[in-house]
Structures are given as C-alpha cells and as structure tokens.
A protein has these predicted regions:
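Non-catalytic, polymerase-adjacent accessory regions of viral genome-replication enzymes
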Residues: 1-79
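Core structural elements
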Residues: 45-48, 96-100, 107, 347-363
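Amphipathic alpha-helical blocks
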Residues: 73-96
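Conserved polymerase palm-domain catalytic core
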Residues: 88-103, 107, 131, 139-305
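Duplex nucleic acid-engaging cores and interfaces of nucleic-acid transaction enzymes
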Residues: 119-120, 124-127, 161
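A conserved non-catalytic segment of reverse transcriptases
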Residues: 210, 284-352, 356-359
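Short, solvent-exposed helix-loop connector elements
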Residues: 221-225, 319, 335-349, 359-372, ...
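Extended C-terminal regions of large enzymes
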Residues: 392-453
Length: 453
C-alpha cells in the first residue's frame, strides 16, 4: 500500500514539474517575442494547450450550463466544430452564452452564488487561464496562496504559523463582502491591459464578464463581478487582489491571502486597530470593493479561524490545529450520510464516508493529531453501529444478529429487547464487542483517520 501511495505521489510531483516547466517556457517565450503578447490568442488556440484544457474540464466534470451539454459530450462536439470555434476565437467573434445561476449553501448560513458556464465556454476559459497564468503568476506576491500552481491552503497556514511563532500574535481578518460579485470591471480590464496587448483576448474577457446570468427564464445583465464557477474567475480574482498584496508588502505588513481570505498579523492590539482601519479604507477607496465590517475582526490566532485551522501556542511551541467549527462541520456531514432513514447498504455508506474522510484528512493533515483522529474514528464507528442497530427493527432480528457475532444468548436477548435508542446503545459494551471499531476497518474497509497522522 505504501509503495502504491509513494508511486502516486511521485507521479503527481512529476506531472507538477512538467506543468510548471511548460508554463515557465510559455511565459519566457511570450516575454522574449516582440509579437508574442499581441498573438496571445494563437497561443491559447494551440493544440497542446487546448488538449490540456479539454482533459482538465473533463476530469472536473461539473454541472451543465444553459445549453445542457455535459462534459462527456464536449470532446465529440469540439472534434466536429473545432474549425469554427478556432476561427471565431482568432477573429474575435466568439459569443459566450450566459452563465447558469446556482446557489450553494454556506457553512455559516446564507448561500454562495455560482455562475456555471457552458462546457464549451469552460474549455475556452480553461485554455485562456493556462496561458494567462503563465504570463501573470510569477508577478504575484509570495504571500498569495489561493488558486496558484504549486501553492495550497496548507502552505498559507504554515506561513501564518511562522508569523505567530515570531511574535505576531494578533490577527486582522479582512472579510470582503461578496467579492466575486463586486469586482469592478473597468479596473480589472485596466489591470489586464497592463500585460496583455492582444485586443482579441481583452475583448473576449470583457465579453465573458458581461455575458449575463440566466435565473429561471430571465437573463440578467451584469455590470460588475466575475461569477464563481468559471475556470478564469480565480485568476481574475488574483489579478484584482494583487494590488492589495503589493500595498501590504509596501507597508511592510505580515500577511497571507488565500483567494479573498486576507489575514494580517501584528504584534499589538493598537497596531491591529490601525491596520484594520487603513487597509479597509484602501480596499474601499482604491479597489472599489466593500469590506464586511461585521465579519472583519481582530482576534488571537488560537481563537479565530483561518481556512478552517487555528494556531495554538503552548509551552513555548506554536502548532497548527483543526478549528472546532471545522470538526463540527465534518460531524454534520457524517450525520447526513449515516442518517437513520436513508436505508442504504453498509457498503454504500462506507464508500461515501471514505470519500469524505479522505478529503477531510488530506486537507487538515497539518492540524490533525493522534488524539483528535482517534476520537473522530471512534465517533464515526459509533454512528455506524447506531445505523446498523436501527436497520434491525424487530427484536428477533437484533437478537439473531448479536448471536451471529458471538454474543451469548442471555445478553443477546437482554440487549435485543431493550427500549433504549440506537445512539445510546451504540456505546453499549455488548454492541461494541459484537462490532468493535476495528471491525469496520478490517472487514468493511472504512478509512481510519489515525493513519493520516
């Protein structure tokens, strides 16, 4: 197993190196060629770039756009219509369709509004993002970590931990209110025009920004914002907020930014208040964005949450931990999967739980310790015992299943006829002996969080 995991890690690393080298090559070629930047659309339409974009869109899957075309249909469509698609792009006549509005519930309440482009527009945006990332990424701040090649939320948290370890123990969390919906189009286009000379690319980006949103049967015209859901949106967001990064660097502030999540670390409460006021003013006046004053706050790293983590200091050591709210969110997801009235087989439940737990542990591995992992492992298995018990509604079924697992007839009858609820019984000694924690791992294949520590 370890050999397979190591091979996968090596393959992923090798792929990342190849992609990074290719991007650096493209950036160098465009920078050195006197006509490179005004022929950017030709680079976007190159076969290798388009094939890479197609593979990315297919692997990401995702919901259809307004034309209802699925990602599984995209390759055949592009093969049949590529000559026209390429001609429209090179002549600046491609007309994107409106994005489809989709609401995603937020963890803290409310909804996040997504704009789902058609799969063809996703392909074109992905091809553009690959070339523009090569052109822009090397200019971004080293303290920007979101949606960038070779960077991650875990790296952002490690940088934050280093700040706290160095004595910057007050954090200013700046919350940008509905950032993706309020990006100023003219300011964004001005920023893009500083590095992009190809008017066709600029025109296409402007067309995407103004393509509209289909809500029900009505197309809403938009004059600001870059809808979340398209491959180009994260890069455009980084281009907008790079101006904030440069301002914070110029002031000598210690910060990390992941997409629109900005955290600034200072030494004193007085400095925190001053920084919060001045940075909020810059965001409002210069970037034409809105700061959510209610959610923007000054806190201690071990109290506040950043990207789902918290940073603690104990006995002279600074550590990264999983925030309580992130643990609570995981438990809500597990409860939804193991809800008593779902009527799913144990193998189906295990498959769903494994997908959830692997993703969660992979993300939170920097803050996951053995004590927390062991507690969560036990809690998940207790949920499964309660689920099993609830499926056997008749006492005789419960008794026969207990006996089949080696329980004596006396205790099988005692427990099988009890009126105690499934959750209370799930920690009962008889049930724990019949279906111990390790049974779910060894016999059912349930992921063990402790293995990630």
């Amino acid at each position: 197993m370890k050999a397979v995991q190591m091979q996968m890690a090596l393959e992923t690393h090798a792929t990342g190196v190849r992609d990074s080298s290719r991007d650096e090559f493209i950036a160098a070629r465009l920078a050195k060629s006197p006509t490179g930047e005004d022929r950017l659309m030709e680079s976007i339409c190159e076969r290798d770039n388009m094939l890479k974009a197609l593979q990315r869109v297919e692997s990401n899957k995702g919901a259809p756009g307004v034309d209802r075309m699925k990602t599984t249909q995209l390759r055949g469509y592009v093969r049949r219509h590529w000559d026209k698609i390429k001609c429209d792009l090179l002549h600046g006549t491609h007309k994107p369709l409106p994005v489809r509005r989709k609401e995603i519930p937020k963890e803290g309440g409310g909804v996040r509004l997504l704009g789902i482009p058609t799969v063809l527009d996703r392909l074109i945006q992905q091809a553009m993002a690959q070339i523009l990332t090569a052109l822009w990424d090397h200019t971004f701040s080293e303290f920007s970590y979101g949606f960038r090649p070779g960077r991650s939320a875990q790296m952002a948290i490690e940088q934050a931990r280093q700040y706290v370890e160095a004595g910057y123990t007050y954090v200013v969390d700046i919350d940008l209110s509905k950032f993706f919906d309020r990006v100023h189009h003219d300011r964004l286009m001005q920023r893009l025009a500083m590095r992009i000379q190809d008017k066709r690319v600029l025109k296409l980006i402007r067309t995407y920004l103004n393509s509209g949103i289909l809500t029900g049967d009505i197309i809403e015209q938009v004059t600001e914002g870059t809808p979340q859901g398209g491959p180009l949106s994260p890069l455009l967001a980084n281009i907008v907020l790079d101006e904030l990064d440069k301002e914070l660097e110029k002031r000598g502030l210690h910060f990390v930014r992941y997409a629109d999540d900005v955290a600034i670390y200072v030494r004193t409460p007085k400095a925190a208040e001053r920084v919060k006021r001045s940075v909020s003013r810059f965001i409002t006046d210069r970037l034409k964005l809105k700061v959510n004053e209610e959610k923007s706050e000054i806190n201690r790293p071990w109290i506040g949450k950043y990207l789902g983590f918290r940073i603690t200091r104990f006995m002279g050591r600074t550590r990264t931990g999983v925030h309580d709210k992130s643990i609570a969110h995981l438990k809500r997801q597990v409860r939804a999967i193991t809800s008593r009235n779902r009527g799913r087989s144990m193998s189906t439940l295990i498959s769903e739980l494994n997908s959830l737990l692997r993703g969660w542990a992979g993300y939170f591995s920097p803050g996951l310790n053995a004590t927390l992992a062991d507690k969560l492992d036990h809690w998940v298995r207790r949920r499964l015992r309660a689920y099993l018990w609830n499926q056997w509604r008749l006492p005789r079924t419960r008794i026969s299943n207990l006996i089949a697992r080696g329980t004596t007839h006396h205790w099988a009858v005692m427990v099988g006829n009890t009126r105690k609820g499934p959750w209370r019984l799930s920690n009962n000694g008889t049930l724990c002996a019949a279906w111990p924690d390790q049974w779910f791992t060894l016999s059912c294949g349930l992921v063990c969080l402790l293995s990630f520590c």
